[in-house]
Amino acid sequence: MPFSLVRIDEDDVLEYVFERYTAINSDADSIRQDLGIQDSKSTTLNIEIAPPKSLINDTNITKKGKKKKGNKSSSDYDFYSFEIKQNVTSLHSTRDNDNSTTGYVLWSLTPVFCEWLLYNEQASPLHRAQMVNICSLEKKIIHDIEFPSLLNEDTTVIELGSGISSVLPILCSNFVGTYICTDQRGILNGLKQNIANNLDLVNKRTIVSETLDISNIQEQPTNSDDETIPIKPTTQLEVAILDWETFPKSIKSGSSNILTDFVKPHGTIFLLALDVIYNEYLINPFLHTLHSIMFYYKNQREIVALVGIHLRSDDIVQEFLEKVTTEFPFKLHVVDDPQWSHSRYDIYYITL
């Protein structure tokens, strides 16, 4: 059964936050009690995105996203093994990147979200468009909607606050037509390097890019008779500077920038943001950027946002939800799924 969406209106915020943190406290023994850094000491991380053992026999899959031929179940799931360089020194610096340093390391929500997205049956609406229930805070079904597919070749993904790791863009580039990573200038060199180091994990599609130097990394394979193997579909993978504090509150019609030049003329646009709301100073700039991009495209095609938040301070989460529901013309829902409800993470679905 797919996930449902719980509607959160202005009048629901206080009750929702209270109930959510009450649930977190009751699950405290089974939930990691830390800030959410995947590894705060290592400069090189080996991260595996793999199906749980309940879904597949471990002996039927291999690393680097390549699967052995065998039974049907082994061909249904991919296994990604990342090597990620992160900068722990810059994380603690007061000088680097204008003191905005959280993007220099991998945070735990990213691999958790990726495994849920790929392997959890309740995430199936993100694989193929289907109907999902809209429920009240009391979990009463109000109506249903067709949820757009994320892992679709017609989808454009714009990630806000990509960070240094490359996990999400590499994984999604096996499925989507366009993926645009954005972050502050100081983060992008490390992100580009991690993309280059893990590009072999994109084995379903061929990457093309105007902002990444990948000409010598991903080449068209040939067979033993020197005949070109059938060309794979392409994914446009780009990296761009985007600072929420300086981003315009409205994008002028006809503007030319990476957010407009590389977006396909059809298909759904997904704005993705994972663990980017962790203090009150980021909330307004982030929401203004989100609204600016969504408003620009709203009359051209479907555009939606998935925002994942690590639930640390209840005051920060409450302020974020209050601003979403009172200061912007957004419709707010939270993904209702057992994996998330018994964790310290929420995934919010935001539309205009």
UniProtKB/Swiss-Prot annotation:
InterPro entries documented for this protein: Methyltransf_16, SAM-dependent_MTases_sf
Gene Ontology terms for molecular function: S-adenosylmethionine-dependent methyltransferase activity
Name listed for the protein in its UniProt record? Ribosomal lysine N-methyltransferase 5
| Gene that produces this protein | RKM5
Enzyme class, top EC level, equals transferase
Q: Does the keyword Nucleotide-binding apply?
A: no
Binding-site residues, S-adenosyl-L-methionine: W107, G161, S162, G163, D183, W244, L274
User: Tell me, what does this protein do in biology?
Assistant: S-adenosyl-L-methionine-dependent protein-lysine N-methyltransferase that methylates 60S ribosomal protein L1.
| Protein family (similarity comment) | Belongs to the class I-like SAM-binding methyltransferase superfamily. RKM5 family.
EC number, as in UniProt? 2.1.1.-
Q: Which UniProt keywords apply?
A: Methyltransferase, S-adenosyl-L-methionine, Transferase
Output the Gene Ontology cellular-component terms.
Answer: cytosol; protein-containing complex
- GO terms of biological process kind: methylation
